[in-house]
Amino acid sequence: MALLIITTILWAFSFSFYGEYLAGHVDSYFAVLVRVGLAALVFLPFLRTRGNSLKTVGLYMLVGAMQLGVMYMLSFRAYLYLTVSELLLFTVLTPLYITLIYDIMSKRRLRWGYAFSALLAVIGAGIIRYDQVTDHFWTGLLLVQLSNITFAIGMVGYKRLMETRPMPQHNAFAWFYLGAFLVAVIAWFLLGNAQKMPQTTLQWGILVFLGVVASGIGYFMWNYGATQVDAGTLGIMNNMHVPAGLLVNLAIWHQQPHWPTFITGALVILASLWVHRKWVAPRSSQTADDRRRDCALSE
């Protein structure tokens, strides 16, 4: 849980840094290439093939390609149509995707209690960030929702792989980032604009921060933390970046939030986490234990 909180704080800076200094100034495909390329370099020394099948390695590369490669390309394009606050608002459905996709991948019945606690988190984040949207609303909304879905598929896929095809996390992430990097290379050569390269030391510095710290270290901590909690808690924590991102905007760019809705929304998100951990998760575990006991008795 602590790793998820630390990463949320770290990522709160990423949204604003990219939106303020890179979006519209640096080619989005090049930004993705540098970001995942630097992250891949961080874990390159841990790349191992011994003891792992090609299928397992390929699956870890696939989830990396989805969670980082494709997700970044979609979300970075969305910055061209949305403000930072709008983009934050449109990510609030991610907990629902995470919870439902995990149930689908696990081939289990949909747990509506998990969906309910995730929906509370969605409501809380929506309270914080609901405001007037720009004319490019629909395009931006579509891009962000596709980004949310690919992020959820990658995150849940990684969690499932750790459950069914485990390997040391640092080895897994070497393949994870390699998959994302291959997607970014292909996208850059096919769609990139070489005329929109970083022009200032600040822009290069932000790219290095996003690649090494936010992606390289941040995603390792997030996905490692994801393996330590249930899918419902994971989905709710994913929405904590909304109040965290707003606090960063307040501290650095002095963008004042509407305090009544900010406090109300943050309390709803925290309440959703408390409700989930107090009632929903224990009840789901008890139900699963009862089913296993019934099956054992019937045998």
From Swiss-Prot:
Primary residence: membrane
Membrane topology of this protein: Multi-pass membrane protein
Residues annotated as transmembrane: 2-22, 26-46, 56-76, 81-101, 110-130, 137-157, 172-192, 202-222, 233-253, 256-276
Record keywords: Cell inner membrane, Cell membrane, Membrane, Repeat, Transmembrane, Transmembrane helix, Transport
Regulation: induction: Expression is repressed by biotin.
InterPro entries: CO/AA/NH_transpt, Diverse_Substrate_Transporter, EamA_dom
Stretches assigned to the EamA domain: 3-128, 139-274
Knockout-associated phenotype: Deletion of the gene abolishes biotin uptake. BioH-bioP double mutant is unable to grow on trace levels of biotin.
Reaction(s) this enzyme catalyzes, per UniProt: biotin(in) = biotin(out)
SUPFAM superfamilies xref list: Multidrug resistance efflux transporter EmrE
Compartments where found: Cell inner membrane
A Pfam family reported for this protein in Swiss-Prot or TrEMBL: EamA
Cystine bridges: none
Regulation: Biotin uptake is weakly inhibited by CCCP and FCCP protonophores and by the respiratory chain blocker NaN(3).
GO CC annotation, single: membrane
Family membership: Belongs to the drug/metabolite transporter (DMT) superfamily. 10 TMS drug/metabolite exporter (DME) (TC 2.A.7.3) family.
Protein function: Uptake of biotin. Acts probably by facilitated diffusion.
NCBIfam families referenced in this protein's UniProt entry, alphabetically: 2A78 (TIGR00950)
Protein name (Swiss-Prot/TrEMBL): Biotin transporter
Organism: Escherichia coli (strain K12)
UniProt lineage: Bacteria, Pseudomonadati, Pseudomonadota, Gammaproteobacteria, Enterobacterales
